[in-house]
Amino acid sequence: SKTLKLEKDDRNVWKYSFEIPCDSQGTTVSWSMHDDENTAKNIGRETSLHASVLLKEKTAEMNNILAQEIPQFRCSDSKFEDIYYYLWSLHMMYYINVQKGWEMENHTQSAVNNFLGIHRYDACFQIKVGAWARNKQRFAYGNVLTWKHLVENGRYRETQNGHIFLSDNKGVGWHSGAYGGELAEHVLGAWQIYQHTGDRGFIRKCYQGYFRKVFWKNMVGFAMNDAEVGRALEKMAVISGNNSDVDHWKKRINQDPKHLRLMFDQRWEANGHKDYFMGGRNGMLMTNAFWAMRSKHFPREYAERMIHSWALNKEQGFFGEFFPLAMAKKSMSFFNSADDQSFGYTPDTAYFTLDGIFSQGFPRIASDLTLNHLKNYNFHKEWKIPVAPEAYKRDLSLFGDQYSNFNAGKILLFLEGLGGLSYSIPD
């Protein structure tokens, strides 16, 4: 093609671009990846040749999943229905079942064209989305248990004080060199799956050789969820037949109400940021202050002040062209790097922030802000169709992957936030 452009970047990574004509009849573009070049080419070629048949098969498959596997949703405003089912479609289409090496469980991913597979951070909400599918063994368990392979094979980073971190992503026999500590949130996701199933065998698999190992010496919490995770580990210990572990978790993770209140009080208005939680010394104010509201121990009076001072504030706060900006307007002029510009609005920060406001018992404010976000972030006004970009730049132009399961947390905003749904089979 005369429009094909190939070039290497400064890291010797090949990049390409091309243009193809497309009229009202449409055109087919196929993309395939395989360790063997010829196999990849043949798959792509066969897909293009049989596109119509394959499209009908995929449509039938997805219609069946959307009709039989997920909670049904209806709304007087059809665009919210479109968004809901579109986000579920992406989440479900990205499931893979490799059955090799460290990929023995069926699990979702964050993008179709992403060889990096499932991401540790993204799984914090993707695990919980899977808990709402009907077939939990197919759509829920693997999002948790696929990470166990790294622990069983000693593929983790352990600090001198006993903190264990897993890589950002992994595959059949590899893992990345970027490590982080969001696994505490995975524990709560696994517990929600148990609440929706009562499957004690699943909890045993999660606890023995995995969560017990990761948190035994020390624990890194996520957005102040330490107490909730500690309580979940105690329950998992009992369910898995490790009753003697309960005392260990009680000593390891302090759940004393006075201690918990002190942890929040010490971080309130830190570094002189009025009505703000855990603000940094450098003045970069991000939405993660709201994420801590997801803890039931977060003082509600603090939440109310922060919501009115920062969430609803269109001058200095997080209400931009819509809610929420990833960074407060007060900080944006000081932090203006290329990355800051690219990630002006992001789906993960929106989920954690709005979930926090719902959790604190402000349903009207949380609902209004959620609807504001969904109709501006996940519905294209010009195209009149749902969208799921990885991010919007500060100037509202699209950024990154345009079919991103990084938006999966919004499904939880529909079900648990707007719908207020919650259930526990064991209880």
Predicted regions and their residues:
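Structural helix-adjacent loops and short alpha-helical linkers that scaffold large soluble proteins
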Residues: 74-84, 97-99, 130-144, 176, ...
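A glycine-rich beta-turn/hairpin centered on an aromatic-Pro dipeptide
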Residues: 412, 426-427
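Aromatic/acidic polysaccharide-binding cleft in carbohydrate-active enzymes
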Residues: 367-408
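Aromatic-rich carbohydrate-recognition surfaces in CAZymes
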Residues: 52, 59, 114-227, 343-366, ...
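Catalytic cores of large soluble enzymes that bind and process phosphate-bearing ligands
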Residues: 32, 72-75, 79, 225, ...
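Extended glycan-interaction surfaces of carbohydrate-active proteins
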Residues: 78-117, 140-178, 214-220, 258-345, ...
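Acidic/polar, glycine-enriched structural segments that form the non-catalytic walls/loops
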Residues: 1-114, 200-207, 212-215, 235-251
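The feature captures the catalytic groove of carbohydrate-active enzymes
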Residues: 14-48, 111-112, 159-185, 208, ...
